[in-house]
């Protein structure tokens, strides 16, 4: 009888300890599962951001500024695509020396 009581007490302590470990393992497994779920959400958000960035890049590519004509390039009329500070004007010598107007700075001629 003296040996049975300590053995029963020891077995009781072992089972209580095992249940405590099992609860801890369940919490760890649950934490791991939650972190994996968060990682998949982050990947999904990243995919949406990349898709939006790709669409924005496509828009930028299609809305590129049209090429313009540089200085002293012959042009047809005032609607010609001369670069920003330049305008299509009839310069000195237009008609008797030059056959068409040129892209020049405004007021220089």
From Swiss-Prot:
It comes from the Eukaryota. InterPro entries: Toxin_22 (IPR012627). One of its GO terms (molecular function) is sodium channel inhibitor activity. Keywords: Cleavage on pair of basic residues, Disulfide bond, Ion channel impairing toxin, Knottin, Secreted, Signal, Toxin. It is found in: Secreted. Disulfide bonds join 68-83, 75-88, 82-103. GO terms for cellular component: extracellular region. Expressed by the venom gland. Residues 19-67 form a propeptide. Residues 1-18 form the signal peptide. Probable ion channel inhibitor. The presence of a 'disulfide through disulfide knot' structurally defines this protein as a knottin. Belongs to the neurotoxin 14 (magi-1) family. 07 (Jztx-56) subfamily. This is U26-theraphotoxin-Cg1a.
